[in-house]
Amino acid sequence: MKNPIKWAIIAVLLSTVVAKKIVGEGMADVSAIKHPEEVHPTNRDFLRSLIFSISMIFGCEIGDKTFIVAALLAFENSRLTVFAGSYSALFIMTLLGVLLGHAAPLLFPRKLTDILGGVLFVIFGIKMLMEAKEVMDSKESMSDEFQNVRNEIAANGPIDQLLEEGAAPSHYTGHRSRSGHTLMSQLKSKGRNVMATLFSPLFIKAFALTFVSEWGDRSQIATIAMAASDNVYGVFMGANVGHACCTALAVISGKYISTKIKVHKVMFIGGILFIAFGLVYFYQGFF
């Protein structure tokens, strides 16, 4: 889905929530008091929601731009710092998506949110299948995707210079106080080094690149749809577990995976998963 359409979907959802707050308490709130189980589908199977969201994230993120960004940044830099920066951005995006999806049943009937979720998943699934066919016909490999993302990053400045900025500030490295032999001073020194590493320019760069890449992405919109129709706690936990696994996979073995994975196969599997999820939500909405 093109970026303007993605932004439009998110804008509509956000504006609806804001309008709800401005107008005040409406019929949806009355319904929530009388029939709370029909508004927030938290009584739905937690395990199913967990599995659905993990599968959705894997289908979206393996080989996606955020995956490639993490892999590229981790090639010659601290994997821990890259993981922390990338995952922090994904965690925040997941939280925003889940909160927005959780608000949807207060604005629309539950069956309608199920049907709308089904429509989104089917559309995304069909689009992924079409993209998979295009990639297969063009014989584009994962290595080509890596190069494309590398070029995008390099467009903002030389890639080597951008990555070198992630070095921890020198004044933190090797710092020891006069009482450095005491346990407390050693703990303080290690704490400063850890903070300098985690919140270094590399951390900020990984966070920013991931946040920008993920905003309005297919996985974020899918998370909103799932949170609106399924157990919100299961979706939140599953999405974060999926993001953690995919990001860890990217920073640990992204370069190796790029030579083994076929882009069109990943997109094909993701498309099938999305269509299957859509059918499940259609069933919930109509029956």
Curated annotation (Swiss-Prot):
Gene Ontology biological process: calcium ion transmembrane transport; Golgi calcium ion homeostasis; Golgi calcium ion transport; manganese ion transmembrane transport; proton transmembrane transport
Pfam families: GDT1
Cellular localisation: Membrane
Recorded topology in the membrane: Multi-pass membrane protein
Keyword list, A-Z: Membrane, Transmembrane, Transmembrane helix
TM segment ranges: 7-27, 50-70, 89-109, 112-132, 194-214, 232-252, 267-287
InterPro entries: GDT1-like, GDT1-like_CS
Gene Ontology molecular function terms on file: calcium ion transmembrane transporter activity; calcium:proton antiporter activity; manganese ion transmembrane transporter activity
GO cellular component terms, semicolon-separated: endoplasmic reticulum; Golgi apparatus; membrane
PANTHER family: TRANSMEMBRANE PROTEIN 165 (PTHR12608:SF1), TRANSMEMBRANE PROTEIN HTP-1 RELATED (PTHR12608)
Protein family according to the UniProt entry: Belongs to the GDT1 family.
Stated name of the protein: GDT1-like protein C17G8.08c
